[in-house]
Structures are given as C-alpha cells and as structure tokens.
Amino acid sequence: MLARGDGASLKLLMENKRKIWPRALLLSTVFLLALSGGFFFRLWPELHRPAPIDPAFRFAPAIFVASLPTAARFDFPMGSENGALTYNAQRFTANRHLGDDLNGIGGENSDLGDPVYAVADGRVLLARDGGSGWGNVVIVLHAYLENGERKYVQSYYAHVDTILVAPKQMVRRGDQIATIGTAHGKYLAHLHFEMREFATPFIGPGYRDDTRGWIDPSAFIAAHRGAPDDDVGRVR
C-alpha cells in the first residue's frame, strides 16, 4: 500500500496503467481476430461450396422426355389389369390422401411380396429409398395422347419392398418393377399409388390439402385403359 506522502509514486503507477491497458486491449483484439479469422478461413469453403441438389428436385432432361414411347393404354399396378383381386383401403383425397392405398383381397400382410407392375410404357425417373414413412419408391414417366395432344403423366409406387428397375430404364406396360412392401415395417403391406401431372421426380408429402398436380389414380386408369373390363390377363 502506498503511503499518503507517496504522491509521485501513485502518479507514476497511474501513468503506467494508462500505457499498459491500451496495449493489452490491442493484443486481446488481435488474438480474438486471429481466432475468428482462423475459424472463418476453415468455414469459407463450406460457405461457398454449392449445395448438392436433391434428385427429387431435378427436372427430367428434355431428351429424356422426348424419347418416351407413347403409351397406348394404362392398367392397374397390382392384381389383374383391371384392378380385380385388390381393394382400395384409402382413396384419393380421403383424409387429404394424394393417392390410393391398394391391398390384396386377403388383407393384412397377405400381399407382401406380390408383384407391382408398370401401369404403362414409360421410363423410370426414380428408384430408391424415399425416406421416413415412404420406404422404397419407384416413379415412372409416361407419354400418352389425348385428343391428338401428347401429354405426360407420372406413376408413383411407394412402400415397395424389392425394387426391380433402375433410373432411366425403359419399361413396358405389365413389366414387374417392384414387390409389395411395408415401408421397412412401418405399415401393413400395401401399395401407395399415385398418378401425377408433372415430370419432376418428387417424393412428395403423401397427404396434402392442395391436390393440384395430382390425379385420381383409379379414375385416370379407368379412363385410359383402352381395354374391356373383362380383359383381366396380363397379356400385352
């Protein structure tokens, strides 16, 4: 402790503090900037690296679309060609549902492993695990004529067990493309089946209030079968 008479010493101490504090502050600032600069330098490549585009949001290439065969007719994806031997457990728009839940007439898991067929000639857009709630998914793009106009529609097969096709592969109506599954054990075996009016291989929500872009699957196939109702065989 300084004595009362040591005024000169106190003055000298205060002057030294005034000199030391700015220097300490400067050194601390430089140190912090160096740390943050090093962190930013490590982060910089991540900030400027382009994010990978999910295949679910890529558009089908023009050559892919142009080379599609024109489908002459559409059939149902399981059971017989006209949908016999199946039942629809949850129809399009019921409970905001964007597709049909198709089941074998035996119920529960009696249809596990049964064939899933391409509904028409087309090309595979996507064939992979669709993530939580979906299990394996196959999407096929089709071209068809309506009133002389070439149009495009997408068939969507979800919760499947085994996938038997690959992206870009051409398929014909009635080709087996998958087997009925349970979405990796999440549900009883059935096929979640959608028909869509867009070409993007989008996995989708499954349930939605706004159904624009989605079509009633059973109604569409019934309107575009091009075959009598008693044609139940899978003969092309």
List each language-model region with its residue ranges.
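Short, solvent-exposed loop/turn segments that connect beta-strands within catalytic domains
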Residues: 108-111, 145-152, 201-207
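Hydrophobic alpha-helical membrane-insertion segments, chiefly the h-region
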Residues: 31-42
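Conserved, short, structured surface segments that act as functional micro-motifs
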Residues: 138-141, 169-235
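Short histidine-centered loop motifs in beta-beta connectors
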Residues: 110, 117, 148-174
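Surface-exposed, glycine-biased beta-strand/turn segments
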Residues: 42-136, 173, 182, 216-236
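Active-site-proximal beta-strand/loop segments in catalytic clefts of secreted hydrolases
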Residues: 105, 120, 127-128, 141-143, ...
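N-terminal Lys/Arg-rich, disordered targeting/topogenic segments
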Residues: 1-21
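N-terminal Sec-pathway targeting helices
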Residues: 15-33
